[in-house]
């Protein structure tokens, strides 16, 4: 365990701060929405370059935000850029690698927590979001890898309500109802329209000023469009 990080929210990555966020006072201002994509992490044990995922964190506000990545099982993951800053109306990519792709860890659900705080106010958390993480078994039989322990052993979460890990459902391809499909299609069309509209400070546009959007609105539209794309790919 890295020095300075509490046991229930240990930072996975270099540069753990001197104190955790469990005892931090609640934010006095409005809560900042934590926009991350994808909304959950699914690692594959047979991934050629090793089980890894790219997590994108968006900052739709007009201020610099400090972020930290915490985990319930820090020994199983390596997080590159586990803490840092996100510029206003910008985004940053965080690479997460699963370093324990063993059969006993298959289908065991862990959790990551993304915490946001204002620049220069240590410990004053203004936004947080929990995302789940799971390691999936290879598509080919375990005997081909010489593994002998295919039974997963759930580990308890230290800052979640459940005392045991709950595996993800084995059927990741639910069918969308017609009403849901039409709603998602409408949301996707609106998101694409927002991405095609000119920026507020863009010159030479023939569209009226009321149809000009900000960069933050385009980031939110891109985030929603990415979520809809994931839903369509899983159906």
UniProtKB/Swiss-Prot annotation:
Spans through the membrane:
180-200, 213-233
Q: What's in the keyword line of the UniProt record?
A: Membrane, Transmembrane, Transmembrane helix
The record's section on InterPro entries has: Ig-like_fold, MOSPD1/3, MSP_dom, PapD-like_sf
Cross-referenced SUPFAM superfamilies:
PapD-like (SSF49354)
Residue span of region Disordered: 1-30, 143-170
**GO CC entries:** cytoplasm; membrane
Keyword Membrane among record annotations = yes
Q: Which residues form the MSP domain?
A: 33-145
The yes or no answer to whether the keyword Transmembrane is present is yes
Q: Which residues form the signal peptide?
A: none
Pfam families for this protein:
Motile_Sperm
Q: Its topology with respect to the membrane?
A: Multi-pass membrane protein
Subcellular localization: Membrane
What is the designated name of this protein? Motile sperm domain-containing protein 3
Q: Specify the species.
A: Bos taurus (Bovine)
Q: Which gene encodes it?
A: MOSPD3
């Amino acid at each position: 365990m890295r020095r300075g990080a509490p046991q229930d929210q240990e930072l996975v990555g270099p540069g753990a701060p001197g104190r955790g966020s469990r005892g931090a006072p609640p934010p006095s201002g409005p809560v900042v929405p934590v926009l991350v994509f994808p909304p959950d992490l699914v690692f594959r044990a047979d991934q050629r370059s090793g089980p890894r995922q790219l997590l994108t964190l968006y900052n739709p506000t007009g201020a610099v935000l400090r972020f930290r990545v915490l985990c319930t099982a820090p020994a199983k993951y390596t997080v590159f850029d586990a803490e840092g800053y996100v510029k206003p109306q910008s985004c940053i990519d965080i690479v997460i690698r699963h370093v324990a792709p063993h059969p006993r860890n298959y289908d065991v659900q862990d959790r990551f927590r993304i915490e946001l705080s204002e620049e220069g106010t240590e410990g004053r958390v203004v936004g947080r979001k929990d995302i789940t993480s799971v390691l999936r078994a290879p598509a080919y039989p375990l005997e081909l890898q010489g593994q002998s322990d295919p039974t997963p052993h759930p580990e308890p979460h230290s800052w979640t309500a459940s005392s045991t890990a709950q595996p993800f459902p084995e059927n990741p391809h639910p069918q969308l109802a017609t009403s849901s499909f039409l709603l998602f299609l409408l949301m996707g069309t609106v998101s694409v329209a927002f991405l095609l509209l000119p920026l507020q400070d863009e010159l030479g546009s023939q569209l009226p000023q009321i149809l000009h959007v900000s960069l933050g609105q385009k980031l939110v539209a891109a985030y929603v469009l990415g979520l809809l794309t994931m839903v369509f790919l899983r159906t």
